[in-house]
Amino acid sequence: MTQGIPAVFLDRDGTINIDHGYVHEIDDFQFIDGVIEAMIELKKMGYALVLVTNQSGIARGIFDEEQFLQLTEWMDWSLADRGVDLDGIYYCPHHPDATEEQYKKSCDCRKPQPGMLLDAQRELSIDMTASFMIGDKLEDMQAATLAKIGTKVLVRTGKPVNTEAEQAANLIINSLADLPKAIKGIKK
């Protein structure tokens, strides 16, 4: 039986794009410098790229699910136009303190819960121990731990890095742009 493919699980806001807070408009979406080139390199290295993003702005009524899906489609096409094909896109619109009742719940998909990562594992046949989770928050690291992802990578491009997040990570880098080089260093 094959183990599956290795993946890089990617948080969105603060990891792929600049986190302006509840980004939901195309005009507000800015890729962080170097991330597209890094994703191209990661694909060449044999990694599936899987987006896993909490989107509590939906639950809070800041934007609706349709707006999120439109932005996500634009982002996906923008990446594809530059040679990056995402293998999976998973999002959680829920929040326990939601103002929008249909999204008000404690769920297993909202990070730090591992639901999105485990769904991707099942649907894409991912080898979790050979995979990486990259994000800017403690919740990203906690979800990766619960999903038994091999390497947890914290980036400094998003929320301010705190001690607890640093301790939960296996590796801390400045940006997703640095991940291919970091992986090559680990694999030596």
Swiss-Prot record:
GO biological process: ADP-L-glycero-beta-D-manno-heptose biosynthetic process; lipopolysaccharide core region biosynthetic process
Binding site for Zn(2+): 92, 94, 107, 109
Key words of the record: Carbohydrate metabolism, Cytoplasm, Hydrolase, Lipopolysaccharide biosynthesis, Metal-binding, Zinc
Organism annotation: Photorhabdus laumondii subsp. laumondii (strain DSM 15139 / CIP 105565 / TT01) (Photorhabdus luminescens subsp. laumondii)
GO cellular component: cytoplasm
Principal location listed in the UniProt entry: cytoplasm
Transmembrane helix among keywords: no
Family assignment from sequence similarity: Belongs to the GmhB family.
Pathway in which this enzyme or protein is active: Nucleotide-sugar biosynthesis; ADP-L-glycero-beta-D-manno-heptose biosynthesis; ADP-L-glycero-beta-D-manno-heptose from D-glycero-beta-D-manno-heptose 7-phosphate: step 2/4; Bacterial outer membrane biogenesis; LPS core biosynthesis
UniProt-recorded name of the protein: D-glycero-beta-D-manno-heptose-1,7-bisphosphate 7-phosphatase
Localisation: Cytoplasm
Disulfide feature: none
Keyword Protease among record annotations: no
GO MF term set: D-glycero-beta-D-manno-heptose 1,7-bisphosphate 7-phosphatase activity; metal ion binding
Gene: gmhB1
Catalyzed reactions: D-glycero-beta-D-manno-heptose 1,7-bisphosphate + H2O = D-glycero-beta-D-manno-heptose 1-phosphate + phosphate
EC number: 3.1.3.82
